[in-house]
Design a protein with these regions (language model features):
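Long, low-complexity, Lys/Arg-enriched
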Residues: 3-291
Length: 291
């Protein structure tokens, strides 16, 4: 990229951002005084590769890319990868837990497809390999719930704290409902709730179990709805050992982290949020594997 002056690259970026249009050509003239000849070449491919490399580096570091650039390239493999990452970011923004985990596998496969022709993508190879390495333990995991645990740990490693809090809450609730009501199912699936009752609500069911199983400390303000109690009494299928769950840290997670964030509060600076979430996740993993 040394043939492209930095100022030209900056101006090109500015034009794309401000006009929301994609450059089709980037002509560069190279005059040779000795031969008195000038050569004009189109450096659009090099310019686009520099954008792609920057985006891959950003994703590798922050699990985010900017949607500012329009990726409408002639290379289908690169197109698929960039669109896959963009879709992942959209799912993350909207807290689509299952879709995010599924998207991780797609991104891994897109990287793999490009790396099969690594000689063609020499400048992108280091970023692709780094991304693949980062996602590999999620990709190879067979258990859906453990995949989610590993994904939350990845979010924590990249300082995506708020979404990690949301997904940790969802994971705990899913696995309680899963093993209390549907222990024969390989994983939690929301459509299974219809088998209990059409009016059943995942949030109410899971909140009821958190207190009924003494995972969270009981409160005078918590009273399960009658229909939830009836559903619970008719469907007591729990075969897991609840004592494997780290009740102390799960309580701290809900009272001092999750509930505070949900109500727009400020978490106490003395609370080690990452440490507490990791302890919760490790105990849920133990509950799944050993319970």
């Amino acid at each position: 990229f040394r043939n492209i002056p930095i100022s030209v690259t900056m101006i090109s970026n500015y034009l794309e951002v401000s006009t929301k249009k994609q450059l089709k050509h980037l002509f560069y003239g190279n005059y040779n005084r000795e031969t008195n000849e000038g050569l004009i070449i189109d450096l659009i491919n090099q310019y686009e590769n520099s954008k792609i490399a920057s985006s891959l580096m950003a994703f590798d570091q922050f699990l985010k890319i900017s949607d500012t650039y329009l990726y409408n390239l002639n290379d289908n493999k690169i197109n698929n990868l960039m669109k896959g990452i963009s879709q992942f970011n959209h799912m993350l923004d909207y807290c689509e837990f299952d879709s995010c985990v599924h998207s991780i596998s797609q991104i891994y496969n897109f990287c793999q497809s490009i790396l099969k022709e690594k000689d063609k993508y020499i400048l992108l190879t280091p970023y692709l390999k780094s991304i693949q390495k980062k996602l590999s333990n999620i990709y190879i995991e067979k258990n859906d719930a453990i995949k989610k645990i590993k994904f939350i740990k990845l979010l924590l490693a990249h300082n995506s704290l708020q979404i990690a809090i949301t997904f940790t809450d969802q994971l705990i609730r899913e696995e309680l409902v899963h093993y209390y009501y549907f222990p024969d199912s390989k994983s939690f699936k929301e459509e299974l709730l219809n088998k209990i009752a059409k009016e059943s609500d995942f949030y109410d069911l899971s909140t009821d179990l958190l207190f009924f199983l003494n995972i969270r400390n009981s409160s005078k303000n918590i009273n399960s709805k009658d229909y939830i109690v009836n559903i619970r009494n008719k469907n007591n299928n729990l075969s897991k050992d609840v004592s494997l769950l780290d009740k102390e840290n799960i309580n701290i997670f809900y009272i001092k982290i999750r509930n505070v964030v949900n109500h727009g509060g400020k978490i106490d600076q003395n609370i080690d949020v990452n440490k507490i979430i990791l302890k919760c996740l490790d105990s849920v993993e133990k509950f799944i594997k050993e319970g």
